Amino acid sequence: MKKVVIAGGGQAASSVAAKLRSEGFDGSIAIICKENHPPYQRPPLSKKYLLGEMTLDRLYLRPLSYYDDQNITLHLGKTVDQIDRAKKQVLFVGENLEYDDLVLALGSQPRRLPEKIGGSLGKVFTVRDLTDVDALAPEFTRDKRVLIIGGGYIGLEAAAVAAQRGLKVTLVEMADRILQRVAALQTSDYFRHLHTTHGVEIKEGVSLARLTGHEGTVTGAELSDGTLIEIDFAIVGVGIFPVTDIASDAGLSISDGITVNAFGQTSDPSIWAAGDCCAFPYRGGELRLESVPHAIDQAELVAQNIMGASLSYFPKPWFWSDQYDVKLQITGLNTGFDNVITRSTNETSISFWYY
């Protein structure tokens, strides 16, 4: 009986397992997940879950009963420590599992502030998993002062929730504009206006110099323009990096993530990767995407290829973000355009077309 082991517990991991079963795979499937929860949705963490509008059970991608019904073994609260490619085994907490095919769906981790500028102070939060958000949620009480470092999706979504909860929000973005890495100027302008009308103070072209604290807890911040502000807590949203350590330790090829070919195979043909953690061929170069649709699409392709399909992956980049009562949807990449067309059918809908 063929054995598939999946390292990781997010959207890609769940999608590989589900697609294998739906395609008729009758071998064993095991998912090794470092969290104590089955695979769950991450996007709502900084939106509806943080607002208290979504319960934990609704976060789960599939109920626990699904894994039992589909004969998928979950190893929760476990982390893969080592891959033995010669023996085709993964080792974790004194156990080992043999595999015929191993899928690395390791995801990514948030970048943290260096300790020397206050990154280790208490009440300095990231927003990546349930543990992060469960620790952060009690801070969201009216009139508290929060500094948000980073003007990407996570920072802006957290700012929206904080403003809706009546907090005093300052957001700093070291680039010239918010959303600079992921969206064009017109989109940045729209969301800057949206946030400022909700009372968020946005400082662009300004970075954090250092956080200050008292008795180990953050109490203030010094910005690069010399501004000093008093705060009750801080949220760091300065990007993520792919988890590649166990792949690197196993001698697999690493670039901006775990390197895979068009089929999703790593430099070891019996080891595959999908989602945030891997970089794949794209138009003569290499690309790594951080989005739920990509994680699902690539994971399902990997599952089909494990079963012999030999399909090549070509992404359909699609991203979304919910802020206040506005939904941002982006299709395509923020590169290689010369012209922008603005279209608006009513006061609540606007679109920007880049070509």
Question: Where does each model-flagged region fall?
Answer:
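Rossmann-like NAD(P)H-binding beta-loop-alpha module
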Residues: A135-A183, V218
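FAD-site-proximal beta/loop scaffold in flavoenzymes
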Residues: S120-T141, H214-E222, T227-Q304
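Mid-to-C-terminal Rossmann-like scaffold of FAD/NAD(P)H-dependent oxidoreductases
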Residues: K2-K3, S22, C277-Y355
